[in-house]
């Protein structure tokens, strides 16, 4: 049997607060709920899913590098590999909700482009219906797809797209 494609789901800053942070915008579903549903769905699509969340830009960049088999320098933190058993295992695609780093992080953009791993950008809220500073994304012009405003279902839509429509 062929090995399943490995997908990495990355969530950025403040997404660990889903379910309690501004529920009128983000809803009441927790990140844990989203990750559990994503694991179930990934299994049904014969995908292997690893999840990762960090409030720190450098940790997200390191995790993207690890997804391509690159590791941080020995002087850098080793905590990601210890906390994430999938770290360092090459992945076929990344689904990323970069949170506020969407609008600020050239570093995350460069990490995604530098690894060459195709990625889907996801946002729980419709960023285009919010404050003007949220309208610009440093990632969307390079993403295979962008999903926003669907609430937690956006993650499901991203996994469905990756599992059924992406060519690896």
Swiss-Prot record:
Molecular function GO terms recorded: 3-dehydroquinate dehydratase activity
Name of the top EC class for this enzyme: lyase
Reactions performed catalytically: 3-dehydroquinate = 3-dehydroshikimate + H2O
Keywords of the record: Lyase, Quinate metabolism
Residues passing through the membrane, by range: none
Metabolic or biological pathway: Aromatic compound metabolism; 3,4-dihydroxybenzoate biosynthesis; 3,4-dihydroxybenzoate from 3-dehydroquinate: step 1/2
Domain of life: Eukaryota
Documented EC number(s): 4.2.1.10
Alphabetical GO biological process terms: 3,4-dihydroxybenzoate biosynthetic process; quinate catabolic process
Active site: 26 (proton acceptor), 123 (proton donor)
Pfam family, one: DHquinase_II
Site positions per UniProt: Transition state stabilizer: 21
Keyword Secreted: no
Chain residues that bind substrate: 97, 103, 110, 124-125, 134
InterPro entries (UniProt xref): DHquinase_II (IPR001874), DHquinase_II_CS (IPR018509), DHquinase_II_sf (IPR036441)
Family, per entry: Belongs to the type-II 3-dehydroquinase family.
Function: Is involved in the catabolism of quinate. Allows the utilization of quinate as carbon source via the beta-ketoadipate pathway.
Known partners and oligomeric status: Homododecamer. Adopts a ring-like structure, composed of an arrangement of two hexameric rings stacked on top of one another.
UniProt cross-references to HAMAP family, sorted A to Z: AroQ
Protein name, UniProt field: Catabolic 3-dehydroquinase
Organism classification: Eukaryota, Fungi, Dikarya, Ascomycota, Pezizomycotina
Name of encoding gene: qa-2
């Amino acid at each position: 049997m062929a090995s399943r494609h490995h997908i990495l789901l990355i969530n950025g800053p403040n997404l660990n607060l889903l379910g309690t942070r501004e529920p009128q915008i983000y809803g009441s579903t927790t990140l844990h709920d989203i990750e559990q549903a994503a694991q179930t769905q990934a299994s049904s699509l014969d995908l292997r899913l690893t999840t990762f969340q960090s409030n720190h830009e450098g940790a997200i960049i390191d995790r993207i590098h690890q997804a391509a088999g690159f590791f941080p320098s020995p002087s850098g933190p080793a905590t990601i590999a210890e906390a994430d058993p999938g770290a360092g295992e090459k992945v076929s695609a990344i689904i990323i909700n970069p949170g506020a780093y969407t609008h600020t992080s050239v570093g995350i953009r460069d990490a995604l482009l530098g690894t060459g791993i195709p990625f889907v950008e996801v946002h729980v809220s419709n960023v285009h219906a919010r404050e003007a500073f949220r309208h610009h994304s440093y990632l969307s012009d390079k993403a295979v797809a962008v999903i926003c405003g669907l609430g937690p279902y956006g993650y499901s839509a991203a996994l469905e797209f990756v599992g059924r429509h992406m060519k690896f």
